[in-house]
């Protein structure tokens, strides 16, 4: 019942937002495409599970530093620290790794979760990375149809997932640029402790709903670059996104 009520609420909010400002559609589409890319990446990496993954896991997490590096690399590739945290907990439950290794992986995952934000901040707002998405999607979809070869098909899902991520970032960036011309979110900026609490709560809520701190962070950076939120409020949103991403691990 709670999930249905949440879904109806989200639809109502989106419907109202589209009615108030049609330019919001591009931002929402960017978030949707970005999340679709994450799902595609997840499906791609699932294709490589099994004995090979377990053997690889033992070799790459036998020390604390290796566990830390493993968490960083896997989160960078999969673009989901929540997913890595849940998978780590399942590895612990299955006895594949010990507690110290699990802690190292989760620490690394929280470091790796910043890579998406660095990508957008360093390149996404200056370089048209959406242009790289098109060939990735084309080659990825071709590989996805290789049903007789599990590895190639998994690689296709991963390549298509990266393409969707880049395309989603491009849509969000362009959407906020157009959105700023018709509606100014900065008028709702709040300073002081009240603003910190409010925007942290918004960051938590957005991450829980989308199940992705990456999506929340990238959305925040795109909004900040378009002048739609203040720097202080953007920091609060980033804090909220990192708090919200821990909820999945706790539930797991």
Model-flagged regions — what are they?
Residues 16-20, 120-121, 140-154:
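Membrane-water interface regions at transmembrane-helix termini and the short interhelical loops
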């Amino acid at each position: 019942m709670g999930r249905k009520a949440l879904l109806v609420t989200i639809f109502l909010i989106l419907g109202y937002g589209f009615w108030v400002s049609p330019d919001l559609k591009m931002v929402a589409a960017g978030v949707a495409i970005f999340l679709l890319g994450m799902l595609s990446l997840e499906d791609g990496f699932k294709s490589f599970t099994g004995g090979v993954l377990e053997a690889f896991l033992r070799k790459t997490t036998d020390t604390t530093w290796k566990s830390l590096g493993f968490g960083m690399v896997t989160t960078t590739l999969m673009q989901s620290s929540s997913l890595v945290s849940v998978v780590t907990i399942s590895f612990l439950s299955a006895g594949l790794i010990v507690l110290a290794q699990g802690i190292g992986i989760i620490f690394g995952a929280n470091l790796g979760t910043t890579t998406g934000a660095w990508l957008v901040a360093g390149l996404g707002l200056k370089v048209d990375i959406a242009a790289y998405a098109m060939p990735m999607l084309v080659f990825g979809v071709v590989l996805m149809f290789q049903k007789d070869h599990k590895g190639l098909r998994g690689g296709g899902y991963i390549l298509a997932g990266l393409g969707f991520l880049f395309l989603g970032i491009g849509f969000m960036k362009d959407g906020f640029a157009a959105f700023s011309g018709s509606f100014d979110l900065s008028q709702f900026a709040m300073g002081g402790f009240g603003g910190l609490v409010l925007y942290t709560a918004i960051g938590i809520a957005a991450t829980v709903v989308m199940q992705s701190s990456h999506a929340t962070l990238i959305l925040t950076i795109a909004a900040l670059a378009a002048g739609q939120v203040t720097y202080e409020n953007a920091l609060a949103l980033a804090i909220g996104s990192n708090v919200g991403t821990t909820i999945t691990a706790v539930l797991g």
